[in-house]
Amino acid sequence: MKSYRQELWFEVPTRRAFVNITPQVEACLRESGVREGLCLVNAMHITASVFVNDDESGLHQDYEKWLEKLAPHEPVSAYRHNRTGEDNGDAHLKRQVMGREVVVAVTDGRLDFGPWEQIFYGEFDGRRRKRVLVKIVGE
């Protein structure tokens, strides 16, 4: 069985962003040489997320609005976490809702997606470097 590991690094210029990372993950898969197996992609930071969905700008705006309703950034004082001097309590909650990782089947050397599925990096407390782990195992 083959095992492949790669780190992808992101630094978005805004507090929140959704980045389609499917091309980078596909490049990792090609480099791994795995034809049949599993591909794990996970955010290695507690205020970032990895998830699968459609790459449609209206949907991304809907996510922004919905997440801000669930866990608004302001007032910063509303979060006990922020009493430590942080201002990102909302980002931790948004990450929890959107998830830490995805696992995608690898079939015949390709990510086995359903219609419209893409892999996204979700950033909820940006403007600094963060990493995503890609781990691929199989034959």
Name each model feature, range by range.
Residues 1-139:
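Active-site histidine-anchored catalytic micro-motif
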